[in-house]
Amino acid sequence: MSFNTFGKQFRFTTWGESHGPALGCVVDGCPPNINLKEQDIQVELDKRKPGQSKFTTQRKEDDKVQILSGVFEGKTTGTPISLIIYNQDMRSKDYGDIKDKFRPGHADFTYFKKYGIRDYRGGGRSSARETAARVAAGAIAKKVLENKLGKKFKVVGAVTQLGILGCDTRKWNDLTINKNPFFCPDKNMLKLWEKYLLDIRKSGSSCGAVIEVRARGIPVGLGAPIYSKLDMDIASAMMSINAVKGVNIGSGMNSAQLSGEQNSDEISQKGKKLKFDSNNAGGILGGISTGQEIVVSFAVKPTSSILTTRKTINKFGKNTTISVKGRHDPCVGIRAVPVGEAMMNCVLLDHYLMNKAQCS
């Protein structure tokens, strides 16, 4: 299986499976002399790790990261940074009854048809467990960007819609997001979401979500025309996350309903200060950052592993039914928030380094 590497100048390769002994990544292209310790990575992994609330999978993983290379005396050396996270709480026996069956909506069918073999234990490589390695890589990108761009730089993500219940993003509050188990930016939605998701969990079903990621303190000029557009790479990054089925940049699909006057973000200058009257472009024009807040949202489909009995086939081409036991997220979108933040950080650093190489 190829295509496990993401990025150009700053790139990472992830490895490992859901029920294997460990997973991890190798980060290449990180600048030297950046202060980095395991705790810098751990704090991001702790946002994503399972078993932290009744609203996520009850699989218990500490997700303790170890830095194996690329850091000396607390600083990056410019050489590849290798990271490892050991798996602890696997229950492969939960999948014994379905090892020959394809879960509807999951990658089981396509993996088997393409490769002729698949790891049925927790989905193997197609499991959202793989995203722990991305979050680790994103934590390194975040450290570099904070060093290069300063205190104004920030990437923050939130769940803005849980199933059929959306929140008012005009009430977005960064401080609220990390104080609730949903990464919800609007405290008024918390009780509604709690009841909604508990009912879904009790029924044995699942729901989808919409996640929004915002990046602030980004300079003008990141990205390049045509085949290296910043929004193109951000969209690719978000679409690579497990279960993501759609991405919007700025107004996204809604921009098709706007008039030219409504959609255009008018610009004015007051002294040395540039002002945009709106941000339908999501902080990117012509594939290049405008200096505004970059706003990206993506839709995550409902978790495919559910208790409800469904029709399917087995690997021998026979009709059968399936009901998936085990421990699964009733909404995988919740834990996708730190993954989206990580991928945003990786893309931004990649383009920052490419821009420095070409234009500095």
UniProtKB/Swiss-Prot annotation:
Pathway of action: Metabolic intermediate biosynthesis; chorismate biosynthesis; chorismate from D-erythrose 4-phosphate and phosphoenolpyruvate: step 7/7
Keyword match Chaperone: no
GO cellular component assignments: cytosol
UniProt feature coiled coil, ranges: none
UniProt-annotated binding residues for NADP(+): 48
Reactions mediated catalytically: 5-O-(1-carboxyvinyl)-3-phosphoshikimate = chorismate + phosphate
Top-level division of the source organism's lineage: Bacteria
A Pfam family the protein falls into: Chorismate_synt
Enzyme class: lyase
Keywords associated with the record: Amino-acid biosynthesis, Aromatic amino acid biosynthesis, FAD, Flavoprotein, FMN, Lyase, NADP
Family membership noted in the UniProt record: Belongs to the chorismate synthase family.
Name recorded for this polypeptide: Chorismate synthase
